[in-house]
């Protein structure tokens, strides 16, 4: 594993470890993470690594269980739906704000993004489609101009990336998502905050419904639950 540079260790550790956890190659949902092992591999002290871990806990990517350690969060069905309920509310407000301030250049950029999404789907490039679709949503949040909403949705988007790796979602109605994006963009062109919020919320609600149908109806043990068993 590549060792980190001595300058800006805290930010480098956060960036590296976040990417490592989201990628899904090394850790599986619910796995315990050894901070000591990562410290040796990266050639840094545990202090910047713990700083990164605390930030990732705030984002909902890891769970710190007292006296037991750090675990990669396992997204059970209930947690997944909770995340999408929050996403619906926040993206609805972001769309409303974006409709009030969006420029013609930004509209053109969003249209180009949708065209890219459709091109990726046509080529069967599902991972690239997901990346472009997330860029679309992130750009709307940026246009909205709210740092608070941006920070909260940044955490949610990170968790969605992790869920996609963990659950290996199968593509089902992705062309419909592109159509939803087109409808939302149409409301931006009209500079209509109310209907933009409506379209954004409906789109996220439809995604949540599809995910709800695809998730298994089973309880997945959390690190905290496993911890109680270990303690007893």
What annotation goes with each model-predicted range?
Residues 79, 83, 104-165, 179-187, ...:
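Conserved amphipathic alpha-helical segments that form helical-bundle/coiled-coil interaction surfaces
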Residues 5, 50, 101-104, 128-131, ...:
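Juxtamembrane/interface motifs at transmembrane-helix termini
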């Amino acid at each position: 594993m590549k060792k980190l540079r001595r300058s800006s260790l805290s930010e480098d550790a956060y960036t590296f470890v976040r990417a490592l956890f989201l990628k899904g190659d090394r850790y599986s949902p619910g796995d315990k993470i050894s901070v000591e092992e990562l410290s040796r591999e990266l050639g840094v002290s545990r202090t910047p690594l713990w700083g990164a871990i605390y930030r990732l806990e705030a984002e909902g990517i890891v769970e710190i269980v007292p006296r037991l350690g750090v675990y990669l969060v396992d997204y059970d069905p209930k947690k997944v739906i909770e995340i999408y309920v929050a996403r619906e509310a926040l993206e609805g407000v972001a769309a409303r704000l974006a409709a009030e301030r969006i420029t013609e250049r930004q509209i053109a950029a969003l249209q180009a993004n949708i065209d890219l999404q459709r091109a990726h789907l046509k080529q069967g490039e599902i991972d690239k489609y997901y990346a472009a679709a997330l860029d679309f949503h992130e750009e709307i949040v940026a246009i909205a101009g709210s740092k608070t909403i941006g920070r909260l949705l940044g955490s949610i988007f990170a968790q969605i990336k992790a869920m996609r790796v963990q659950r290996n979602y199968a593509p089902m109605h992705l062309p419909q998502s592109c159509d939803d994006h087109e409808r939302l963009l149409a409301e931006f062109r009209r500079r209509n905050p109310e209907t933009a919020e409506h379209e954004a919320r409906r789109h996220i609600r439809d995604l949540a419904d599809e995910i709800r149908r695809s998730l298994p109806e089973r309880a997945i043990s959390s690190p905290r639950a496993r911890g109680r068993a270990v303690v007893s």
